[in-house]
Amino acid sequence: MNVCWSLKGGSGTTVVAAGLALAAARRGIRPLLIDLAGDLPAVLGVEGAGPGVTDWCSAADGPGPEALEQLAIEVPGGTRLVALGTSGWHDAEAERVAALAGHLVQSDGPLVIDVGNLGTTSVPEALLGPLVERATRSILVTRACYLSLRKLPAQVRRPTEVALVVEPGRALGRTDVEAVVGSPV
């Protein structure tokens, strides 16, 4: 399970998650891409206004978490996307959120999950915590930007690795980011 997250909006988390899923598909792996941030349909050029993760979490008497794959949209390039959905996280049933977290953490299939910005996400902690903490790859997506990195010391969660979005003209580099984060770039 690959979980992509950031500490600042606009860091590129959605693009990195999409890239990971599409790269896996090119290698013959058919990952399930799960959008908890809401931007993946637009990035991938597919319709995402239908039911998704939040709708499943809000359906009190709905089917089990294995049915989530039935909500997947085929994406050109060989991956499948479960969109965020049309319900808000505030409508989610606590038991369904916990069941989803358990299902995803125990899944044997290839997963790429876009959590988005941890600082502003409305994803329930009962889902967010297990995903970030138990991910095979917990990937902090950041730019070599002081504003992005200054939030890290206050963050309880630590990534297993960093996806550094490189931009010309930045004063910070790879070694600076590794030193601050304490994880490989």
Residue ranges and their predicted role:
Residues 2-37, 104:
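Walker A/P-loop phosphate-binding motif and the immediately C-terminal alpha-helix
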Residues 27-28, 49, 53-59, 87, ...:
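Cytoplasmic membrane-interface segments at the C-terminal ends of transmembrane helices
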Residues 27-80:
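Phosphate-binding loop that captures ATP/GTP phosphates
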Residues 67-69, 75-85, 92-102, 115:
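Flexible loop/N-cap segments at domain edges
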Residues 84-87, 138-139:
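Short, basic, glycine/proline-bearing loop/turn elements
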Residues 87-93, 119-124:
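Glycine-rich, Arg-bearing micro-motifs that act as flexible, cationic patches
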Residues 99-106, 110-185:
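Conserved catalytic-core segment of NTP-binding enzymes
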